[in-house]
Regions:
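Intrinsic-disorder/coil detector with helix-boundary
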Residues: 2-5, 12, 16-19, 164-205
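Hydrophobic packing positions characteristic
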Residues: 2-168
Length: 205
């Protein structure tokens, strides 16, 4: 160990002057304690699905740290990060994360542990910590595998919905204000029933 050289992130000029040495130490202190964002993989998810509020994920950073000798320091899991859901008021698109998803963990300037679900009034930070990995949020949808269930909005002003297991619509009515509905090549508006005699009927029962 005596003849090993600690590489670290010291520059050739870091020891050339008192100013350079001080700049080196200050820069390293900042780099050690200020977290901004890092790519992560989801290892566990607490998600309630449709009808439930957005939940939390456990994630593991995908970029490892290295020590002064250049050795890899395995990353540790980060727990209970609130995950992003596309929502406005009571309307939302529910696509909850699952283990194996890749996303981005972003870290807050101050301790946000006192913020509760649905809170609308500001609160004091839970502590004096700054830019900590303990105050992270998860934003999903980066570098993932091709989807199998999806809604595709095209530039030709059409929308394609692909769902191999079927589609369920929970609504008292479905309104198509104009146009037609085509099912298996048959028009809802213009289809005909062969072999029928004319007459009058009431509403379907």
């Amino acid at each position: 160990m005596a003849d090993e050289v600690v590489k670290g992130n010291k520059k050739y000029t870091s020891g050339n002057s008192a100013y350079n040495a001080q700049e080196f130490h200050v820069r390293n202190l900042i780099m050690q304690h200020v977290n901004t964002a890092t790519p992560v993989i989801v290892t566990a998810a607490q998600a309630g699905g449709a009808g439930a509020a957005a939940g939390y994920v456990t994630v593991k950073p995908l970029v490892a740290q290295i020590d002064g000798f250049g050795n890899t320091v395995p990353p540790v899991e980060l727990f209970k990060l609130p995950y992003f859901r596309y929502q406005g008021g009571v309307a939302a698109v529910v696509i909850d994360p699952v283990p194996g998803d890749i996303g981005l963990a972003v870290f807050c300037k101050s301790d946000c542990s006192n913020i509760q679900q649905g809170q609308i009034e500001p609160v004091q930070p839970g502590s004096f910590r700054k830019f900590s990995q303990s105050d992270g949020f998860y934003i999903g949808g980066f570098l993932n595998k091709p989807p199998e269930v999806f809604i595709e909005i095209n530039q030709d002003k059409s929308i394609t919905i692909t769902a191999a297991a079927g589609i369920t619509v929970n609504a008292p009515t479905v309104t198509v204000p104009d146009g037609d509905v085509i099912a298996s090549g048959i028009s809802l508006v213009h289809h005909k029933h062969p072999g029928c005699q004319g007459g009058s009927t009431g509403e379907p029962t």
